[in-house]
Curated annotation (Swiss-Prot):
Catalyzed reactions: 2-deoxy-alpha-D-ribose 1-phosphate = 2-deoxy-D-ribose 5-phosphate; alpha-D-ribose 1-phosphate = D-ribose 5-phosphate
Keyword Isomerase: yes
Localization per record: Cytoplasm
UniProt function note: Isomerase that catalyzes the conversion of deoxy-ribose 1-phosphate (dRib-1-P) and ribose 1-phosphate (Rib-1-P) to deoxy-ribose 5-phosphate (dRib-5-P) and ribose 5-phosphate (Rib-5-P), respectively.
Lineage: Bacteria, Bacillati, Bacillota, Bacilli, Bacillales
Top-rank lineage group of the source organism: Bacteria
UniProt pathway: Carbohydrate degradation; 2-deoxy-D-ribose 1-phosphate degradation; D-glyceraldehyde 3-phosphate and acetaldehyde from 2-deoxy-alpha-D-ribose 1-phosphate: step 1/2
Keywords: Cytoplasm, Isomerase, Manganese, Metal-binding
Similarity comment text for this entry: Belongs to the phosphopentomutase family.
Binding-site residues, Mn(2+) 1: D13, D327, H328
Native source species: Bacillus thuringiensis (strain Al Hakam)
Annotated GO MF terms: magnesium ion binding; manganese ion binding; phosphopentomutase activity
Protein name: Phosphopentomutase
Length: 394
């Protein structure tokens, strides 16, 4: 008998809670995503996260301890060697990653692009982080006139290649992306995903077509999601979760346009009758505010998210469990534009916790979440991670 029929896992992308013990190795001493945002905002207003026990993990400006938190609380340390989205999420579901995925905030190394030009016979333009629509406005006409390839990246571990469908035929673009995928399996260039981004139209009026194709990396081992799916449990992936695991172990995927859309979809899944895992990633914190080093926007986004939690609490049933965490930090007042190596919060709540919650021991790996989910549903336990299921008292 499962202790909980449904587990709702929410990853607040990049919401770290202070430097990890190994932060210095990552150039991240002093990083503190929520703490610094709270200071910048002169106090964060997150009453619902506070009720769950956020301030009991650590007090910050506007975020105080409560005598009787609704849920269980602690923080988790990442065991894997990376601080990117894929590493954090794969570890949450029970894997240990010893080769970090690379991000390229300054663009890709010349050696890689030289090799790509040589193997494809086409010149490369762009080579910087950019929004897909903006880079077409900037370079689409040049791409059409020269037959070059627009190569760009984002805050995530991706290499994207855009070309006009009438200039570079789709089958050629796909071949080019396969070549890029092979080249980026090298550890020093290891990107999580290569994406073909074909477009059509005229200068000033370009549109991306549905012929996008992703060349992702599958998790290199079985995750708890695979075990759930193979045991006929539901695994509902919301936001970019399905992409992060390349669809592995996913039974249903719901796309989202924003954090608020993600919260809408979470409420939708709360209304569904299923047995298994609902897994939501809220990416805006990271993509729109962390990398752009915008503490004000980040703080406002955290408050907007918090304001949606009462809808979630209202719909949770006695045999539901809500788990809230993050996948890494991205301190918007830290130097550079990259993620930061931090502890992440962990909050666990069910309406069946009539006595409220208490502190859980510090978690030594994000995989403790995967182990807890696996134990709850009686599926094969991951190699890494220690379940805290029995520490959650009803």
């Amino acid at each position: 008998m499962n202790k909980y029929k449904r587990i709702f896992l929410v990853v607040m992308d990049s919401v770290g809670i202070g430097e990890a013990p190994d932060a210095e190795q990552f150039g991240d001493l002093g990083s503190d995503t929520i703490g610094h945002i709270a200071e910048h905002m002169n106090g964060l207003h997150m009453p619902n996260m506070v009720k769950l026990g956020l301030g009991n993990i650590r007090e910050m400006k506007g975020i105080s301890k409560v005598e009787k938190p609704l849920g269980y609380y602690t923080k988790m340390q990442e065991k894997s060697t990376g601080k990117d989205t894929m590493t954090g999420h794969w570890e949450i579901m029970g894997l240990y990653i010893d080769t970090p995925f690379q991000v390229f905030p300054e663009g890709f190394p010349k050696e890689l692009l030289d090799e790509l030009e040589e193997k494809t016979g086409r010149k490369i333009i762009g080579n910087k982080p950019a929004s897909g629509t903006e880079i077409l406005d900037e370079l689409g006409q040049e791409q059409m006139e020269t037959g070059s390839l627009i190569v760009y990246t984002s805050a995530d571990s991706v290499l994207q290649i855009a070309a006009h469908e009438e200039v570079v035929p789709l089958d050629e673009l796909y071949k080019i992306c396969k070549i890029a995928r092979e080249l980026t399996l090298d550890e020093k260039y290891m990107v999580g995903r290569v994406i073909a981004r074909p477009f059509v139209g005229e200068p000033g009026n370009f549109t991306r077509t549905p012929n996008r194709h992703d060349y992702a990396l599958k998790p290199f081992g079985r995750t708890v999601m695979n075990e759930l799916k193979d045991s006929d449990y539901d695994v509902i992936a919301i936001g970019k979760i399905s992409d992060i695991y390349d669809g592995e172990g996913v039974t249903e995927s719901l796309r989202t346009k924003s954090n608020m859309d993600g919260m809408d979809k979470l409420v939708d899944t709360l209304n569904m009758d299923f047995t298994g895992l609902s897994f939501l990633n809220l990416v805006d914190f990271d993509a729109l505010f962390g990398h752009r080093r915008d503490p004000q926007g980040y703080g406002e986004a955290l408050q907007e998210y918090d304001a949606r939690l009462p809808e979630v609490f209202e719909k949770l049933k006695e045999d539901d469990l809500l788990l809230i965490t993050a996948d890494h930090g991205n301190d918007p007042v830290h130097h550079g534009t990259d993620h930061t190596r931090e502890y992440v919060p962990l909050l666990a709540y069910s309406p069946s916790m009539k006595e409220g919650g208490q502190e859980l021991p510090l978690r030594q790996t994000f995989a403790d979440i995967g182990a807890t989910v696996a134990e709850n549903f009686g599926v094969k336990m991951p190699e890494y991670g220690t379940s805290f299921l029995n520490e959650l008292k009803k």
